[in-house]
From Swiss-Prot:
Gene Ontology biological process: aerobic respiration
Gene: nuoH
Gene Ontology terms: cellular component: plasma membrane
Family: Belongs to the complex I subunit 1 family.
Protein name: NADH-quinone oxidoreductase subunit H
Gene Ontology MF terms in the entry: NADH dehydrogenase activity; oxidoreductase activity, acting on NAD(P)H, quinone or similar compound as acceptor; quinone binding
Compartment(s) of residence: Cell membrane
Source species: Buchnera aphidicola subsp. Baizongia pistaciae (strain Bp)
Catalyzed reactions: a quinone + NADH + 5 H(+)(in) = a quinol + NAD(+) + 4 H(+)(out)
Documented EC number(s): 7.1.1.-
Alphabetical list of Pfam families matching this protein: NADHdh (PF00146)
Role noted for this protein: NDH-1 shuttles electrons from NADH, via FMN and iron-sulfur (Fe-S) centers, to quinones in the respiratory chain. The immediate electron acceptor for the enzyme in this species is believed to be ubiquinone. Couples the redox reaction to proton translocation (for every two electrons transferred, four hydrogen ions are translocated across the cytoplasmic membrane), and thus conserves the redox energy in a proton gradient. This subunit may bind ubiquinone.
Transmembrane segments: 15-35, 81-101, 114-134, 149-169, 184-204, 237-257, 265-285, 299-319
Length: 322
Protein backbone atom coordinates (compact mmCIF):
# COMPACT_ATOMS: atom_id res chain seq x y z
CA UNK A 1 0.00 0.00 0.00
CA UNK A 2 1.25 3.52 -0.84
CA UNK A 3 0.77 5.97 2.03
CA UNK A 4 0.51 9.77 1.86
CA UNK A 5 3.78 11.32 0.62
CA UNK A 6 5.90 13.13 3.22
CA UNK A 7 7.10 16.20 1.31
CA UNK A 8 4.73 19.16 1.32
CA UNK A 9 4.71 19.54 -2.50
CA UNK A 10 3.86 15.88 -3.04
CA UNK A 11 1.21 16.05 -0.32
CA UNK A 12 -0.48 19.05 -1.94
CA UNK A 13 -0.36 17.34 -5.35
CA UNK A 14 -1.83 14.17 -3.87
CA UNK A 15 -4.67 16.03 -2.13
CA UNK A 16 -5.41 18.11 -5.23
CA UNK A 17 -5.48 15.01 -7.45
CA UNK A 18 -7.81 13.24 -5.01
CA UNK A 19 -10.23 16.18 -4.83
CA UNK A 20 -10.29 16.60 -8.63
CA UNK A 21 -11.05 12.91 -9.25
CA UNK A 22 -13.80 12.73 -6.61
CA UNK A 23 -15.41 15.99 -7.80
CA UNK A 24 -15.31 14.75 -11.40
CA UNK A 25 -17.06 11.54 -10.32
CA UNK A 26 -19.81 13.51 -8.55
CA UNK A 27 -20.30 15.78 -11.57
CA UNK A 28 -20.36 12.78 -13.92
CA UNK A 29 -22.96 11.05 -11.76
CA UNK A 30 -25.14 14.18 -11.83
CA UNK A 31 -24.83 14.56 -15.60
CA UNK A 32 -25.55 10.86 -16.09
CA UNK A 33 -28.95 11.25 -14.46
CA UNK A 34 -29.94 13.80 -17.12
CA UNK A 35 -28.36 11.84 -19.98
CA UNK A 36 -30.30 8.77 -18.89
CA UNK A 37 -33.60 10.65 -18.92
CA UNK A 38 -32.86 12.10 -22.36
CA UNK A 39 -31.87 8.71 -23.80
CA UNK A 40 -34.94 7.04 -22.30
CA UNK A 41 -37.07 9.80 -23.82
CA UNK A 42 -35.59 9.25 -27.28
CA UNK A 43 -36.00 5.47 -27.08
CA UNK A 44 -39.61 5.83 -25.88
CA UNK A 45 -40.51 8.37 -28.60
CA UNK A 46 -40.84 11.37 -26.28
CA UNK A 47 -38.72 14.42 -25.50
CA UNK A 48 -37.43 14.00 -21.97
CA UNK A 49 -36.13 17.03 -20.00
CA UNK A 50 -35.44 19.81 -22.54
CA UNK A 51 -36.67 23.04 -20.93
CA UNK A 52 -33.88 24.11 -18.55
CA UNK A 53 -30.95 25.40 -20.59
CA UNK A 54 -30.15 24.36 -24.15
CA UNK A 55 -31.72 20.93 -24.76
CA UNK A 56 -31.99 20.40 -21.00
CA UNK A 57 -28.27 20.79 -20.28
CA UNK A 58 -28.95 22.72 -17.05
CA UNK A 59 -31.47 20.20 -15.72
CA UNK A 60 -28.84 19.03 -13.21
CA UNK A 61 -28.74 22.50 -11.66
CA UNK A 62 -32.54 22.64 -11.46
CA UNK A 63 -32.66 19.21 -9.81
CA UNK A 64 -30.05 20.22 -7.23
CA UNK A 65 -31.91 23.44 -6.38
CA UNK A 66 -35.16 21.50 -6.05
CA UNK A 67 -33.59 18.93 -3.69
CA UNK A 68 -31.82 21.54 -1.54
CA UNK A 69 -34.96 23.61 -1.02
CA UNK A 70 -37.33 20.75 -0.26
CA UNK A 71 -38.34 20.22 3.35
CA UNK A 72 -35.74 18.12 5.18
CA UNK A 73 -38.33 16.06 7.00
CA UNK A 74 -37.61 13.31 9.54
CA UNK A 75 -40.64 11.14 10.41
CA UNK A 76 -41.58 11.33 14.09
CA UNK A 77 -41.91 7.54 14.30
CA UNK A 78 -38.44 6.81 12.83
CA UNK A 79 -35.17 5.89 14.56
CA UNK A 80 -33.63 9.30 13.93
CA UNK A 81 -29.88 8.65 14.27
CA UNK A 82 -29.98 5.52 12.12
CA UNK A 83 -32.31 7.29 9.70
CA UNK A 84 -29.68 10.01 9.19
CA UNK A 85 -26.67 7.67 9.00
CA UNK A 86 -28.11 5.37 6.29
CA UNK A 87 -27.96 7.77 3.28
CA UNK A 88 -24.49 9.00 4.26
CA UNK A 89 -23.25 5.40 4.41
CA UNK A 90 -24.85 4.64 1.03
CA UNK A 91 -23.13 7.66 -0.51
CA UNK A 92 -19.67 7.14 0.97
CA UNK A 93 -19.29 3.34 0.76
CA UNK A 94 -18.97 3.06 -3.03
CA UNK A 95 -17.48 6.54 -3.51
CA UNK A 96 -14.42 5.29 -1.58
CA UNK A 97 -13.90 2.55 -4.20
CA UNK A 98 -13.04 5.28 -6.74
CA UNK A 99 -9.85 5.93 -4.76
CA UNK A 100 -8.36 2.54 -5.70
CA UNK A 101 -9.23 2.55 -9.43
CA UNK A 102 -6.29 3.64 -11.63
CA UNK A 103 -7.04 5.98 -14.54
CA UNK A 104 -3.50 5.46 -15.81
CA UNK A 105 -0.23 4.00 -14.43
CA UNK A 106 0.43 7.30 -12.63
CA UNK A 107 -3.11 8.52 -11.82
CA UNK A 108 -4.46 6.61 -8.82
CA UNK A 109 -5.39 8.04 -5.43
CA UNK A 110 -4.50 4.99 -3.32
CA UNK A 111 -2.56 2.07 -4.78
CA UNK A 112 -3.84 -0.71 -2.52
CA UNK A 113 -2.34 -4.19 -2.70
CA UNK A 114 -5.76 -5.55 -1.69
CA UNK A 115 -7.73 -3.44 -4.17
CA UNK A 116 -10.22 -6.14 -5.20
CA UNK A 117 -10.88 -7.11 -1.59
CA UNK A 118 -11.39 -3.45 -0.69
CA UNK A 119 -14.07 -3.17 -3.39
CA UNK A 120 -15.86 -6.29 -2.12
CA UNK A 121 -15.66 -4.94 1.44
CA UNK A 122 -17.20 -1.58 0.45
CA UNK A 123 -19.88 -3.33 -1.62
CA UNK A 124 -20.82 -5.38 1.44
CA UNK A 125 -20.89 -2.23 3.56
CA UNK A 126 -23.42 -0.63 1.20
CA UNK A 127 -25.89 -3.40 2.13
CA UNK A 128 -26.06 -2.04 5.68
CA UNK A 129 -27.13 1.39 4.46
CA UNK A 130 -30.13 -0.10 2.66
CA UNK A 131 -31.08 -2.32 5.60
CA UNK A 132 -30.72 0.54 8.10
CA UNK A 133 -32.77 2.88 5.88
CA UNK A 134 -35.67 0.44 5.65
CA UNK A 135 -35.63 -0.51 9.33
CA UNK A 136 -35.20 3.01 10.72
CA UNK A 137 -38.04 4.42 8.58
CA UNK A 138 -40.55 2.29 10.52
CA UNK A 139 -42.58 1.92 7.31
CA UNK A 140 -43.75 -1.47 6.03
CA UNK A 141 -43.02 -0.66 2.38
CA UNK A 142 -39.55 0.64 3.23
CA UNK A 143 -38.82 -2.44 5.33
CA UNK A 144 -39.99 -4.84 2.61
CA UNK A 145 -37.88 -2.99 0.05
CA UNK A 146 -34.79 -3.11 2.25
CA UNK A 147 -35.24 -6.83 2.93
CA UNK A 148 -35.54 -7.46 -0.80
CA UNK A 149 -32.47 -5.34 -1.50
CA UNK A 150 -30.42 -7.05 1.21
CA UNK A 151 -31.31 -10.57 0.06
CA UNK A 152 -30.61 -9.64 -3.55
CA UNK A 153 -27.31 -7.88 -2.89
CA UNK A 154 -25.95 -10.55 -0.54
CA UNK A 155 -26.82 -13.29 -3.05
CA UNK A 156 -25.27 -11.55 -6.03
CA UNK A 157 -22.18 -10.47 -4.07
CA UNK A 158 -21.28 -14.16 -3.89
CA UNK A 159 -21.12 -14.25 -7.70
CA UNK A 160 -19.42 -10.86 -7.77
CA UNK A 161 -16.60 -12.12 -5.55
CA UNK A 162 -16.21 -15.46 -7.34
CA UNK A 163 -16.10 -13.79 -10.76
CA UNK A 164 -13.22 -11.58 -9.52
CA UNK A 165 -11.17 -14.56 -8.39
CA UNK A 166 -10.40 -15.75 -11.93
CA UNK A 167 -8.99 -12.31 -12.76
CA UNK A 168 -7.00 -12.26 -9.52
CA UNK A 169 -5.61 -15.74 -10.20
CA UNK A 170 -4.52 -14.76 -13.70
CA UNK A 171 -2.84 -11.56 -12.45
CA UNK A 172 -1.49 -13.28 -9.29
CA UNK A 173 -2.40 -10.11 -7.40
CA UNK A 174 -5.31 -8.21 -5.86
CA UNK A 175 -3.70 -4.92 -6.93
CA UNK A 176 -5.62 -3.06 -9.67
CA UNK A 177 -2.47 -1.85 -11.46
CA UNK A 178 -1.08 -5.41 -11.52
CA UNK A 179 -4.39 -6.65 -12.93
CA UNK A 180 -4.18 -4.13 -15.79
CA UNK A 181 -0.51 -4.97 -16.43
CA UNK A 182 -1.40 -8.68 -16.67
CA UNK A 183 -3.68 -7.86 -19.63
CA UNK A 184 -0.91 -6.54 -21.88
CA UNK A 185 -1.25 -8.59 -25.06
CA UNK A 186 -4.58 -10.22 -24.11
CA UNK A 187 -7.50 -8.62 -22.29
CA UNK A 188 -9.29 -10.69 -19.66
CA UNK A 189 -12.55 -10.53 -21.61
CA UNK A 190 -11.31 -13.48 -23.73
CA UNK A 191 -9.97 -15.98 -21.13
CA UNK A 192 -12.42 -14.74 -18.46
CA UNK A 193 -15.57 -14.37 -20.58
CA UNK A 194 -17.83 -16.33 -18.21
CA UNK A 195 -16.40 -14.36 -15.30
CA UNK A 196 -17.17 -11.12 -17.13
CA UNK A 197 -20.79 -12.16 -17.72
CA UNK A 198 -21.24 -13.06 -14.05
CA UNK A 199 -19.54 -9.84 -12.88
CA UNK A 200 -21.65 -7.67 -15.18
CA UNK A 201 -24.93 -9.29 -14.10
CA UNK A 202 -23.95 -9.12 -10.42
CA UNK A 203 -22.94 -5.48 -10.96
CA UNK A 204 -26.44 -4.70 -12.21
CA UNK A 205 -27.85 -6.28 -9.06
CA UNK A 206 -25.40 -4.37 -6.84
CA UNK A 207 -26.52 -1.07 -8.41
CA UNK A 208 -30.22 -2.04 -8.11
CA UNK A 209 -30.68 -1.35 -11.81
CA UNK A 210 -33.04 -2.90 -14.36
CA UNK A 211 -33.82 -5.74 -14.39
CA UNK A 212 -32.73 -6.02 -10.73
CA UNK A 213 -34.60 -3.01 -9.31
CA UNK A 214 -37.21 -4.93 -7.31
CA UNK A 215 -36.17 -3.18 -4.05
CA UNK A 216 -37.40 0.12 -5.54
CA UNK A 217 -40.36 -1.16 -7.56
CA UNK A 218 -42.86 1.70 -7.55
CA UNK A 219 -45.88 -0.46 -8.43
CA UNK A 220 -45.42 -2.82 -5.49
CA UNK A 221 -43.43 -1.05 -2.77
CA UNK A 222 -44.10 2.66 -3.41
CA UNK A 223 -40.41 3.39 -4.17
CA UNK A 224 -38.97 0.95 -1.64
CA UNK A 225 -36.54 1.65 1.17
CA UNK A 226 -36.19 5.41 0.60
CA UNK A 227 -39.90 6.22 0.57
CA UNK A 228 -39.61 8.32 3.77
CA UNK A 229 -36.53 10.26 2.62
CA UNK A 230 -36.64 13.76 1.16
CA UNK A 231 -34.39 16.70 0.34
CA UNK A 232 -30.62 16.14 0.64
CA UNK A 233 -30.98 12.70 2.24
CA UNK A 234 -32.92 11.43 -0.76
CA UNK A 235 -30.36 13.13 -3.01
CA UNK A 236 -27.57 11.10 -1.38
CA UNK A 237 -29.39 7.85 -2.21
CA UNK A 238 -30.15 9.12 -5.71
CA UNK A 239 -26.60 10.19 -6.54
CA UNK A 240 -25.22 7.10 -4.79
CA UNK A 241 -26.95 4.87 -7.34
CA UNK A 242 -25.19 6.64 -10.21
CA UNK A 243 -21.87 6.54 -8.37
CA UNK A 244 -22.29 2.77 -8.06
CA UNK A 245 -22.82 2.59 -11.85
CA UNK A 246 -19.60 4.55 -12.41
CA UNK A 247 -17.74 2.27 -9.98
CA UNK A 248 -18.97 -0.97 -11.58
CA UNK A 249 -18.29 0.36 -15.10
CA UNK A 250 -14.78 1.42 -14.05
CA UNK A 251 -14.07 -1.98 -12.52
CA UNK A 252 -15.31 -3.80 -15.64
CA UNK A 253 -12.99 -1.63 -17.75
CA UNK A 254 -10.07 -2.25 -15.38
CA UNK A 255 -10.50 -5.97 -14.75
CA UNK A 256 -11.74 -7.25 -18.11
CA UNK A 257 -11.01 -4.68 -20.83
CA UNK A 258 -7.44 -3.66 -20.13
CA UNK A 259 -8.11 -0.49 -18.15
CA UNK A 260 -5.95 2.27 -19.62
CA UNK A 261 -4.37 0.01 -22.29
CA UNK A 262 -4.87 1.25 -25.85
CA UNK A 263 -2.97 2.67 -28.84
CA UNK A 264 -2.13 6.26 -29.86
CA UNK A 265 -4.16 8.28 -27.35
CA UNK A 266 -3.23 9.00 -23.69
CA UNK A 267 -3.86 6.13 -21.29
CA UNK A 268 -6.57 7.92 -19.28
CA UNK A 269 -8.51 8.55 -22.54
CA UNK A 270 -8.97 4.81 -23.10
CA UNK A 271 -10.01 4.20 -19.52
CA UNK A 272 -12.63 6.97 -19.61
CA UNK A 273 -13.91 5.84 -23.04
CA UNK A 274 -14.37 2.23 -21.91
CA UNK A 275 -16.07 3.33 -18.70
CA UNK A 276 -18.48 5.64 -20.55
CA UNK A 277 -19.40 2.81 -22.94
CA UNK A 278 -20.47 0.58 -20.05
CA UNK A 279 -22.33 3.42 -18.37
CA UNK A 280 -24.32 3.81 -21.60
CA UNK A 281 -25.00 0.05 -21.64
CA UNK A 282 -26.51 0.39 -18.15
CA UNK A 283 -28.88 3.04 -19.51
CA UNK A 284 -29.81 0.99 -22.59
CA UNK A 285 -30.56 -2.05 -20.42
CA UNK A 286 -32.96 0.03 -18.34
CA UNK A 287 -34.75 1.09 -21.53
CA UNK A 288 -34.88 -2.42 -22.99
CA UNK A 289 -35.61 -5.02 -20.31
CA UNK A 290 -38.73 -5.56 -18.21
CA UNK A 291 -38.72 -6.15 -14.45
CA UNK A 292 -38.92 -9.91 -13.70
CA UNK A 293 -40.62 -11.43 -10.71
CA UNK A 294 -38.52 -11.36 -7.53
CA UNK A 295 -38.32 -15.15 -7.07
CA UNK A 296 -37.31 -15.65 -10.72
CA UNK A 297 -34.55 -13.09 -10.35
CA UNK A 298 -33.15 -14.88 -7.28
CA UNK A 299 -33.39 -18.28 -9.00
CA UNK A 300 -31.57 -16.84 -12.01
CA UNK A 301 -28.67 -15.89 -9.76
CA UNK A 302 -28.25 -19.32 -8.18
CA UNK A 303 -29.08 -21.39 -11.28
CA UNK A 304 -27.26 -19.36 -13.93
CA UNK A 305 -24.71 -16.94 -12.42
CA UNK A 306 -23.39 -19.33 -9.78
CA UNK A 307 -22.63 -22.17 -12.26
CA UNK A 308 -21.06 -19.59 -14.61
CA UNK A 309 -18.61 -18.45 -11.94
CA UNK A 310 -17.73 -22.04 -11.00
CA UNK A 311 -17.11 -22.97 -14.66
CA UNK A 312 -14.95 -19.87 -15.01
CA UNK A 313 -12.87 -20.76 -11.93
CA UNK A 314 -12.40 -24.37 -13.05
CA UNK A 315 -11.42 -23.22 -16.55
CA UNK A 316 -8.93 -20.71 -15.11
CA UNK A 317 -7.43 -23.33 -12.78
CA UNK A 318 -6.94 -25.81 -15.64
CA UNK A 319 -5.22 -23.17 -17.80
CA UNK A 320 -2.89 -22.16 -14.96
CA UNK A 321 -2.00 -25.75 -14.06
CA UNK A 322 -1.52 -27.14 -17.55
Amino acid sequence: MIFLPISSIETKTYIFQSIVILVCVLITASIMSVVERRVLGLLQNRYGPNRVGWQGTLQVVADMIKLFFKEDWIPTFSKKITFLIAPILAFISLLLVITIIPLSPSIVIVNLDIGVLFFLMMASLSVYSVLLAGWSSNNKYALLGSIRATAQTLSYEVFLGLSCMGVVARAKSFNMIDIVDSQIGLWNIIPQFFGFLAFFIAGLALCHRHPFDQPESEQELADGYHIEYSSIKFGLFFIGEYISIIVVSSLISTMFFGGWLGPLFPSYFWFILKTLCFMMIFILIRASLPRPRYDKMMLFGWKVCFPLTLINLIFTALIMLY
